[in-house]
Regions:
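Tandem repeat scaffolds
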Residues: 1-149
Length: 149
């Protein structure tokens, strides 16, 4: 494919199931987009940089991508794969992370304070100085099958 998108914005687009093999996304912002099932992990790694606002990203994959400081704002991210992803200092503002998979994901300094429905194992994901709300603590203890009231 080898398409290059640099310093651009996609607004009100339905790009669901788009094949991005080898595509370069450099400083690309998606606003109010439907991006279901996209394999962002197949994009070119060099200078990969994206941000998302008011978008649907359900069933997409960012596995093994380097995405420090990425901003996800008011997004649905159900069943998204973040396996092996570097999300250092990323922000998940008002995002639904139901069934999102975090495993060997770099989460140092990431901000989950307004995110919800996440389940993250602190033992399997480095998360030094990551930020969570008190309501979100349950999502960090899920594997222990304990009741918090």
């Amino acid at each position: 494919c080898n398409n290059i998108f640099m310093d651009c914005e996609f607004i009100d687009c339905n790009l669901s199931m788009t094949q991005l093999i080898g595509t370069s996304l450099k400083t690309v912002h998606f606003r109010n987009c439907k991006l279901l099932g996209i394999e962002f992990h197949s994009c070119a790694d060099f200078m990969f940089g994206v941000s998302f606002q008011d978008s649907l990203l359900d069933y997409s994959s960012f596995a093994n991508k380097k995405m420090p400081k990425t901003k996800f704002n008011t997004c649905s991210m159900k069943d998204v794969s973040f396996i092996g992803t570097n999300l250092t200092n990323a922000t998940f503002e008002n995002c639904n992370l139901d069934n999102a998979v975090f495993n060997e994901t770099q989460l140092a300094g990431a901000d989950f304070r307004t995110a919800y429905n996440y389940k993250i194992d602190p033992e399997a994901n480095p998360m030094r100085k990551a930020k969570f709300s008190t309501q979100g603590i349950v999502g960090l203890l899920d594997k222990y099958d304990i009741k918090i009231e």
